[in-house]
Amino acid sequence: MIKLWHLILIALYTAGFSVMAGEARTVLALGDSITSGGKSFVCYREVLVQELKKRDDGFQFIGPEKDKASAHAGYGGKNTKALLKISEKVFAAYPADIVMIHSGHNSFSKDKPVAGIIRDTEAIIENALAANPEVTILLAQVIPAGKLPKYSYIPELNVELADLASRLSTRGDNIVLVDHADGFDWKTDTVGDKVHPNAAGARKMADKWMAALLALP
């Protein structure tokens, strides 16, 4: 009889574990080359995914692209407007529980791009909400770059991204602002192009994303 109860308890535990394992929250990382990764620099996902696996915290990365780190929706060289054009299709195919957006590079300061980037970012978020009204958006204030004057608009952009997150949160959307600019120094945290993260920079980005993910209810 005792042996039978042991078998029942083991079966219940296994079934419960399987249910919990099946409840992993899906995460879609959307962005440019900083999200997609490359041979000449370190991608934050390489660090983030490994750290989350160590903690067994139940996040599953999804997306149309895939590398050794994870699935994702990162596209090298794409600015926010280009990401907007593909976002509806991506979100329809991969309606994630959580969308991480790091987008704002690949524009030019001389074009005064900030207003357009904000407008396109909001439209991307609307597309994510259309695919999953319960989605949580982790919206990044993007990492600074030393490639100047091209990226001299980034400080202004990050102020406006914070305002966007605040406005959308006020109307009831699940928006979490993730400040990747704070503590990130392009002089020490990027490779020679002064834009893409080195190992130290990728670690800083991964830590910020992980803190935001683990803080979610």
Predicted features, each with a name:
Residues M1-W5:
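Positively charged n-region of N-terminal signal peptides that target proteins for export
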